[in-house]
Amino acid sequence: MTAVRRIRAAALPDLPDASWSNALLVGEELVMSGMTAHPATRQAAERGAARDAHAQARVVLGQVKALLEAAGGHVGNLYKLNVYVTRIADKDAIGRARQEFFAGQGTFPASTLVEVSGLVFPELLVEIDAWARLDIDLANCDEA
């Protein structure tokens, strides 16, 4: 039977009443739940300084990195991202955040970006779920 381990990161504490896991390591594959910039985005909105899609995407990608590192991995292990946005017009801002996050990597993960009618809280503009394999590195990706 393939080993399964729940991954936790100090930068992304599990909610006490959550009915999900932020990340599971199944063998060498890390599967991450959809991540948002909550609660930081809500706190910023309450101060009258709402975070734009670029800022939210950077927070979320930082959470993805924290979970990867907690599992013993790195950004080069990411092979698939699903990006959900509430405004398709934000796709360029999300793209900029991705360029910054994957700077120097060469090969980007496969990705889907779709517009959705809403996320769990109204101030959220971006949600990302991710898959990684600890036994691959996209920095060493061959071209077909």
Question: For each predicted feature, which ranges?
Answer:
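N-terminal presequence-like segments and the immediate start of the first folded domain
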Residues: 1-62, 66-79, 86-144
